[in-house]
Amino acid sequence: MAGKQIAQRPGFLKDFIQNFRLDALCLFDEKRILISQELPTPKQRWAEGHEIGHLIIPWHGPISLGDDKYTLKANCHEAMEAEANLAARRLLFLRDKFKVRALSSEPTLSHVAELKKLFGNTMTTTFYSLVEVLDIPAFGLITDHPKKPGKDFDRFNPCRYFITSPSFDSQFGQITDQQLYAIVEKYCRWGKWDLGATETVLTDNNGERSVFHMETIFNHYDALT
């Protein structure tokens, strides 16, 4: 996002984009969205949807023009980004049409690939959206390739995203992404797509044990489990 001062100073706008390495930028005053051409084409659609989310959520615009004691808090900006992501998912996945399709088949990575083609979004955003709408206990991990993590990999925060279905939250809320990623590291192999699969037993909040099927692929950008 950017405020009025950025829109009125093109030179500053260029420096702003380069210094902060932005993939997308929303100019509220002009109702204009800028997308970096360096961003892979499949991801540009998501970036545009995300910035549209900022535009259509009423309270995001005023915040882009300045900060007060509330908006300076980190959790405020985290909330804004989460809301923009939610808006993007609702726009790009056609609201409840995606949920109907998502629940029409077993929740496998093959099904994710089918939904990706049907709705025209990236594998990663489709995967994220599928896990969220499942009506069974399920989770998803979005990470680096387990066998060749990036330079900024953090052992204590190994997952870029840890997605859970509502029933997983209510029944397995004590399970952490670190625990699950440790399992992924054990079964994953070197590869460019299919990294492996396994079954694991997780204990719920009541002490009952359930078997979960886990599978991981790498789509050149993210490892999806």
List the model feature ranges, each with a label:
Residues 1-225:
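Active-site hotspot residues in diverse enzymes, especially metal/ion-binding acidic/histidine motifs
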